[in-house]
Curated annotation (Swiss-Prot):
DNA-dependent ATPase involved in processing of recombination intermediates, plays a role in repairing DNA breaks. Stimulates the branch migration of RecA-mediated strand transfer reactions, allowing the 3' invading strand to extend heteroduplex DNA faster. Binds ssDNA in the presence of ADP but not other nucleotides, has ATPase activity that is stimulated by ssDNA and various branched DNA structures, but inhibited by SSB. Does not have RecA's homology-searching function. It comes from the Bacteria. Its EC number is 3.6.4.-. The gene is radA. ATP binds at G89, D90, P91, G92, I93, G94, K95, S96. The lineage of its organism: Bacteria, Pseudomonadati, Pseudomonadota, Alphaproteobacteria, Rickettsiales. Belongs to the RecA family. RadA subfamily. Keywords: ATP-binding, DNA damage, DNA repair, DNA-binding, Hydrolase, Metal-binding, Nucleotide-binding, Stress response, Zinc, Zinc-finger. A zinc finger (C4-type) spans 8-25. This is DNA repair protein RadA. InterPro entries: AAA+_ATPase (IPR003593), DNA_repair_RadA (IPR004504), KaiC-like_dom (IPR014774), P-loop_NTPase (IPR027417), RecA_ATP-bd (IPR020588), Ribosomal_Su5_D2-typ_SF (IPR020568), Ribsml_uS5_D2-typ_fold_subgr (IPR014721), Rubredoxin_2 (IPR041166). GO terms for molecular function: ATP binding; ATP hydrolysis activity; ATP-dependent DNA damage sensor activity; damaged DNA binding; zinc ion binding. Residues 347-444 are annotated as: Lon-protease-like. SMART domains: AAA. One of its GO terms (biological process) is recombinational repair.
Amino acid sequence: MTKKHYICSNCGNISPKWSGQCFDCGVWGSIVEEIISTNQVIVKVGSKQDFDKLSGHVTEQLRIPTPIGEFNRVLGGGLVLGSAILIGGDPGIGKSTLLLQLAASNFASKMNCLYITGEESLDQIKLRAIRLNLTNYNTDILAATNLENIIASIEANKNNIDLIVIDSIQTITTKELSSPPGTVSQIRTCANELVNYAKQNNIIILLSCHVTKDGQLAGPKILEHLVDTVLYFEGDHNNHFRILRSYKNRFGGVGEIGVFEMSGSGLIEVTNPSELFLMQREQNVIGTSIFAGIEGSRPLLMEVQALMVPSNMVTPRRSAVGWDANRLSMILAVLSSRIGLNLANYEVYLSIAGGLKIADPASDLAVTASLISAATGNPVPEHSVFFGEISLSGEIRKTAKAETRIKEAVKLGFNKIICSKFENLTYDFISSVSHLKDLKEIIK
């Protein structure tokens, strides 16, 4: 008799019967059926393993730089032998392009790369390589979806393989399970087998993975725990910018970003994203300001845009693109309570130019400056940048890495820095503010 249980695709919790909501993580509609294989052999006897000392010899983790500098930045300097990297993103965002550019670049002359696709045929891969001008390098390619066949093919050539690309993990299946491709059990089992094999043989493995409509990696949450590094490819299909961001990295920092521009010949690195994001900006535009932000260790200048429209609705709309909508509501409440700027009868729209997403609390001051400018009809001072966190009392608080933010702004020609007076900076071009009342006086 076939046995089955039910597993949550969000957290991996297993339950004996189906329910509409996971009792462990509370997510609705995440419970899926999983067939338990009845021919598994349970081995109860283990083998002894030797202990090691925490103070014992450490094998140095050598980094292998790739030809893609922005990719190296996100990883923390390059690839580490035996590491497993998961790259997620919407379909068509550029994951396959990035992986093919990596595997079929001059990197392939130093490392033996194998590109395995379960989504395309070999001819389709070759045609894409021709379009991206990547046919000069002798990279091995394989079109396969069966896990056992893939591992057997790698095993036969493992002495000539240093890096494996799997595009994508959702298409790989194992004969041990009867469930269809892309299910929780298939993804978990196949990913676990591939990652373990790669680590045992000191091979670098890169797995691509689709994301759900909520922006989460498709498949079980355990997939993120199996790998050493989790990267997300962010961007809008209507925008040519792409952001590669690290969310987990055992060999480097978290939150680092790499910026790319999608072109007809593939992904192009953007080494100075601040200049590119501000290239088409006009001066003295009402409702816009420049935020001096930090993404990982990289300073980045971004344009914040605000628009207000009179509304007859009982509850006017508040919309934020690239920024937290709840934080926008908080800032509007502080403006109303602390400086008497009542926006209850206005629709408020906020957008971060270039398709970027900001989570830095230091963006509060730039957002508030744009809102005050849009509400009063007065532009912010020319050639000015803003950074600072706003408290519920309306005070402007100091932020991390102020010097780094200022240097990036000065490098791009901005000569007026508006930040908290608690930064204790003595530059002549700094206008210190301690409260929202001071900011309102500047924008008039």
